[in-house]
Amino acid sequence: MTKEMPVIYIISDALGETAEYVSRAAAAQFSGIRTKIRKVPYVQDEIHIDEILEEAAKEQAIIAYTLVVKKLRNYLEEKAKDYGLRTVDILGPLIKMLADQTGLLPSYTPNVTHILDEQYFRKVDAIEFAVKYDDGKDPRGVLLADVVLIGVSRTSKTPLSMYLAHKGIKAANIPLVPEVSPPQELFRVPSQKVIGLTLKPDLLNQIRTERLRTLGLGSSADYANYERIVEELEYARGIMRKVGCPIIDATGKAIEETASRILEILYKGERNV
């Protein structure tokens, strides 16, 4: 047995992070040894593979690779045999298994993960946007949003904004209160980008009463007063009519269901709900 420091060459047509994570996870299973990892990203041709394997052979390195182009994978395997190097194909077996399972052909597109990276950062931006422009904190967000949610308190504007943010949708929300005029920005955006949210007064009364109880406050406050709730809902509906936006009655609907309706409206341009 030897405790000689093993060397792993990471060869990838992208950044090589996948193979690096796997290699480090495997090496971590062996205490008392250190592992050298040499990562070579963006390998696109056979000449580059030749150069890498020539260097790897000097250290009798293990080759871990993520190459989606089959021709390059086959070439690497053959050349590695010539040098007596051991190889590990990180992606190939799983791609083949998925193809066998689904009956579909893989695209064999190198560096396709950048698409996922773009989706991830779009989601992060949308989440930060939702937090920044929640509950009418800054009315300028109305002009920047993909969608603006309006409604009285406790109609799920904030959770819906966050849910949509996780879909990459930038959502701002504005509370509608009879004593406070909505920001003028609300009337400057296209009405199809605004969604009105409402609930049946009985349900809203229950939700607000429970909210007060959770906060340790009495249920006699105007916030949970039935007549006050009806007044707020009528006021809000008037604002929604003035804006000319679709209105969703979220009574009895889960957040996911309401969000699905919002997305349908945005993508299909529906006017009446």
UniProtKB/Swiss-Prot annotation:
Q: Name one GO molecular function term.
A: ATP binding
Keywords assigned:
Kinase, Nucleotide-binding, Serine/threonine-protein kinase, Transferase
Question: Which InterPro entries is this protein grouped with?
Answer: Kinase-pyrophosphorylase, PPDK_reg
Highest taxon of source? Bacteria
Q: What is its EC number?
A: 2.7.11.32, 2.7.4.27
Q: Where does ADP bind?
A: G151, V152, S153, R154, T155, S156, K157, T158
How would you classify this enzyme at the top EC level? transferase
Which intervals of the chain form a coiled coil? none
Chemical reaction(s) catalysed: N(tele)-phospho-L-histidyl/L-threonyl-[pyruvate, phosphate dikinase] + ADP = N(tele)-phospho-L-histidyl/O-phospho-L-threonyl-[pyruvate, phosphate dikinase] + AMP + H(+); N(tele)-phospho-L-histidyl/O-phospho-L-threonyl-[pyruvate, phosphate dikinase] + phosphate + H(+) = N(tele)-phospho-L-histidyl/L-threonyl-[pyruvate, phosphate dikinase] + diphosphate
In terms of HAMAP family, this protein maps to:
PDRP (MF_00921)
Q: Which family does it belong to?
A: Belongs to the pyruvate, phosphate/water dikinase regulatory protein family. PDRP subfamily.
Tell me the function of this protein: Bifunctional serine/threonine kinase and phosphorylase involved in the regulation of the pyruvate, phosphate dikinase (PPDK) by catalyzing its phosphorylation/dephosphorylation.
The name this protein goes by in its record: Putative pyruvate, phosphate dikinase regulatory protein
The protein's organism comes out as Desulfitobacterium hafniense (strain DSM 10664 / DCB-2)
